[in-house]
Swiss-Prot record:
HAMAP family: Rel_fac_2. This is Peptide chain release factor 2. Signal peptide: none annotated. Peptide chain release factor 2 directs the termination of translation in response to the peptide chain termination codons UGA and UAA. It comes from Acidithiobacillus ferrooxidans (strain ATCC 23270 / DSM 14882 / CIP 104768 / NCIMB 8455). The keyword 4Fe-4S does not apply. Its main location: cytoplasm. The gene is prfB. PANTHER family: CLASS I PEPTIDE CHAIN RELEASE FACTOR (PTHR43116:SF3), PEPTIDE CHAIN RELEASE FACTOR 2 (PTHR43116). It is found in: Cytoplasm.
Length: 365
């Protein structure tokens, strides 16, 4: 348990930080907007336009997700100050311990809210797609791509995100050539956007009878799911659409009928595919959503590259930039951008990526 002076100092510090968060989050403006949204939803005629009603419902949930924890935090700190003085006046050690525990809870929530301030990008709150592509190197690289796929699926599951494998191309001997995951959840793109880049694996290959050390690469590209409010002009004449039978390492999560869809956007060379549903129509709709999202993100990256073309201090944006090295026989995984290094390689490959992601976000990558 903290000393009394430490409790007072922490309590005062938290109050200052919460006041800063209230201003940053425009809490009073959000509260006013929430009242407007609630009034609109209470109007029975709103359900004549189901789409608008659903949109307002989503906005209400998003506003409440900000306002409710901040109100609870403010009330908790106000009560905590009073309880601290009461515990001291009555020399109640049990109450003092309870106040200390409440301060820990408040500190954890404040740190979480401060961390979320880093999600300032226009699309950070969006769902996202994660594309994984094996590099050159045959079976070893394809096995590495599948390890990365597993890593992100485990990461998503541990954070309560819904992760759907929308496309997978199986490797010739083991692993995968490529895969696409649709990740749905609060700030999915904000969390994962700094994972875009080349991931390098160094290990003694289980596919080499001589047990020699091999270096393999796999590319990860993360892009936000774009809703219909964003205009992305796609000329149908620029599209090449193919159907095929789904196959791959997705097990029961991947459909095995002839309804799989592959769409090639000829001007850009972008290829997207979806094989999750037995309905060809639904797979086509999902593939088009992926294409729109990918075109949007590539345009945003193109603008960013042009803007930063003369600044070598900034990270390169795109597929060619190596971001992390996984040296398994030395039990070392190092992020080459932030310098963060971890020794428990299996834990990371099982989805423990937060240390890398948080450091990258704090560094403004």
């Amino acid at each position: 348990m903290r000393e009394v002076n430490e409790m007072r100092a922490l309590h005062d510090d938290l109050q200052v930080r919460v006041a800063g968060l209230r201003g940053y989050l425009d809490l009073e403006e959000k509260r006013g907007r929430l009242e407007e949204v609630q009034r609109e939803l209470e109007d029975p005629t709103i359900w004549n336009n189901a789409e608008k009603a659903q949109e307002l419902g989503r906005e209400r949930s998003a506003l409440e997700a900000v306002i409710t924890p901040m109100d609870k935090l403010t009330a908790s700190l106000a009560d905590g100050g009073e309880m601290l003085e009461l515990a001291l006046s009555e020399q109640d050690a049990e109450l003092l311990a309870a106040v200390d525990a409440d301060l820990d809870t408040a500190l954890s929530l404040v740190e979480k809210l401060e961390f979320q301030r880093m999600f300032s990008g226009a699309q950070d709150a969006a769902n996202c797609f994660v594309d994984i592509q094996a590099g050159a190197g045959g079976t070893e690289a394809q096995d590495w791509a599948e390890m990365i796929l597993r890593m992100y699926l485990h990461w998503a599951e541990s954070h309560g995100f819904a992760a759907e494998l929308v496309e997978v191309s199986e490797g010739e001997v083991a692993g995968i050539k490529s895969a696409s995951i649709h990740v749905r959840g609060d700030h999915a793109f904000g969390w994962l956007r700094t994972e875009t880049g080349v991931h390098r694996l160094v290990r003694k290959s289980p596919f080499d009878s001589g047990n020699r050390r091999h270096t393999s690469f796999a590319s990860v590209f993360v892009y936000p799911e774009i809703d219909d409010s964003f205009e992305v002009d796609i000329n149908p004449a620029d599209l090449k659409v193919d159907t095929y039978r789904a196959s791959g390492a997705g097990g029961q999560h991947v459909n095995k009928t002839d309804s799989a869809i592959r769409i090639t956007h000829v001007p850009s060379g972008i290829v997207v595919a979806c094989q999750t549903d037995r309905s060809q129509h639904k797979n086509r709709a999902e593939a088009m959503r992926m294409l729109r999202s990918k075109l949007y993100e590539m345009e945003m990256q193109k603008r960013a590259v042009e803007k930063q073309a003369l600044e070598d201090s900034k990270s390169d944006i795109g597929w060619g930039h190596q971001i992390r090295s996984y040296v398994l026989d030395q039990s070392r995984i190092k992020d080459l951008r932030t310098g963060v290094e971890v020794g428990d390689t299996q834990k990371v490959l099982d989805g423990a990526l937060d240390m890398f992601i948080e450091a990258a976000l704090k560094a403004g990558l």
